[in-house]
């Protein structure tokens, strides 16, 4: 447990984002280099370690590596040393856990019925590193028949592992909304097309659409207007749509676009909604 904690805290201090994670990758390679495994670098700063146990098949265990663009204000002695970046989603813990597995394999404390491939994936929070890693043929080359992953869940009691049949983690989609209106002085607002008003209507209706459904439809960023005394002529919104069910996902996106068209007609604004589809549910 001491080594797990030390690894987690060391990794917590050096959070990096995206697919270029030189410090994180160096830490992992340094720890794994002492073990009887083959180190691999299939894509960008991904780190993989292959433990050959002389079996025909291989099982893979995967951890994400990247952090979030969040400023840490915990005041902890092992807090982030990189301003504006933080392991706020538990990936430091995931890496420490997989390193712990590697140490047990190296020490012969466990003898699986298959070879073991450990995969540390960059860019999980952004573009996703899994697809480009798979595209290298890594899984086929090492005869991987199954891949296991996990995610820390602070709401669960200590020592409890939760799972279920079917989808566990949702499909994701990055939503972007551009609303274009016409700016006039606030005193003559009725002569303009208020992009901020349109955004407010759109937000409240989209949130109402998702209420009570097994999904997430929320926006985390909105930028609008240029002056306190002028009607906004442009609003930019960024959000996320996540669902466990593909049918619900498609229905919500169709209804969201219909709401956007209705708001545009009501306000005289042009409402453009785009959906960048992310990875499928797991």
Q: Language model features by range: what are they?
A:
Residues 6, 10, 27-30, 100, ...:
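Alpha-helical scaffold segments in soluble metabolic enzymes
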Residues 1-4, 17, 21-25, 94, ...:
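Generic structural signal for well-ordered, non-membrane alpha-helical segments
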């Amino acid at each position: 447990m001491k080594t797990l904690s030390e690894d987690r805290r060391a990794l917590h201090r050096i959070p990096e984002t995206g697919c270029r994670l030189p410090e994180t990758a160096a830490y992992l390679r340094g720890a794994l280099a002492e073990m009887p495994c083959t180190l691999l670098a299939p894509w960008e700063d991904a780190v993989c370690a292959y433990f050959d146990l002389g079996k025909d098949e291989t099982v893979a265990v995967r951890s994400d590596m990247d952090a979030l663009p969040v400023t840490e204000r915990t005041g902890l002695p092992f807090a982030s040393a990189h301003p504006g970046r933080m392991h706020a989603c538990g990936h430091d813990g995931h890496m420490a856990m997989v390193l712990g597995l590697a140490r047990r394999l190296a020490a012969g404390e466990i003898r699986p019925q298959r070879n073991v491939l450990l995969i540390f994936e960059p860019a999980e929070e952004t573009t996703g590193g899994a697809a480009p890693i798979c595209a290298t043929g890594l899984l086929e080359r090492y005869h991987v028949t199954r891949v296991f992953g996990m995610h820390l869940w602070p709401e669960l009691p200590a020592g409890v592992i939760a799972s279920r049949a079917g989808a566990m983690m949702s499909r994701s989609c990055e939503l972007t909304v551009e609303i274009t209106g016409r700016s006039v002085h606030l005193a003559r607002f009725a002569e303009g097309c208020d992009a901020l008003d349109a955004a407010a209507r759109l937000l409240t209706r989209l949130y109402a659409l998702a209420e009570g459904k097994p999904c997430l439809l929320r926006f985390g960023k909105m930028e609008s207007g240029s002056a306190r005394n002028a009607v906004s002529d442009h609003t930019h919104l960024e959000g996320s749509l996540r669902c466990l069910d593909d049918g619900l996902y498609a229905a919500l996106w169709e209804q969201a676009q219909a709401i956007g068209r209705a708001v545009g007609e009501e306000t005289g604004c042009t409402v453009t909604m785009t959906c960048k589809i992310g990875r499928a549910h797991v």
